[in-house]
């Protein structure tokens, strides 16, 4: 990171309280920064592949329509995140990315294409078994991204 200027930040946003909190913390740490708010969406084929029993019922022309709906919802979530970021004093644009393999790979690809210098993500407290099986986005980004990562923990309960 350059020390003369505020970095361009890729801010991962999924609509959760954790992601909203990450926007607030980012605004406090980097007032007026340029952020690219990213939501990653999953194509229907990926969902069907996980639940093979659904395949006979969801084929044909339903998949493109469902994907269009998923992409529209993703764009809407990214817009929501960008709006929150702007309200927090950041210079924000909304972006969505179609998942092709894993969420972390989509985030890394977007960080490159959008010229980000820092990735920010909220974190969730997953149980040990859940984290072992599923993993976390922040952990995967730490392992695979060449960019610095700022993982914002969830706020402590009152």
What are these regions (language model features)?
Residues 118-144, 154, 158:
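Glycine-rich, Arg-bearing micro-motifs that act as flexible, cationic patches
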Residues 58-76:
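A short acidic, glycine-rich active-site loop
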Residues 2-63, 90-93:
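Small/aliphatic-rich secondary-structure junction motif
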Residues 25, 72-81, 106:
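Short, solvent-exposed amphipathic alpha-helices that sit
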Residues 28, 112-113, 143:
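Solvent-exposed polar/charged
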Residues 2-4, 82-119, 157-158:
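Structural beta-alpha unit
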Residues 52-56, 111-113, 137-138:
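Short, hinge-like loop/turn segments at secondary-structure boundaries
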């Amino acid at each position: 990171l350059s020390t003369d200027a505020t970095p361009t930040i890729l801010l991962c946003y999924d609509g959760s309280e954790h992601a909203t909190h990450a926007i607030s913390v980012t605004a406090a740490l980097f007032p007026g920064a340029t952020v690219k708010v990213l939501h990653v969406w999953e194509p229907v084929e990926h969902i069907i592949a996980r639940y093979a029993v659904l395949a006979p019922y969801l084929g044909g022309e339903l998949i493109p329509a469902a994907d269009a709906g998923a992409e529209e919802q993703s764009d809407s979530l990214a817009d929501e995140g960008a709006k929150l970021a702007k309200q927090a004093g950041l210079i924000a644009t909304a972006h969505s990315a179609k998942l092709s393999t894993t969420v972390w790979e989509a985030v890394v690809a977007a960080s490159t294409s959008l010229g980000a210098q820092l990735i920010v993500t909220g974190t969730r407290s997953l149980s040990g078994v859940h984290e072992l099986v599923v993993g976390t986005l922040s952990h995967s980004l730490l392992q695979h991204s060449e960019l610095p990562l700022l993982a914002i923990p969830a706020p402590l309960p009152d």
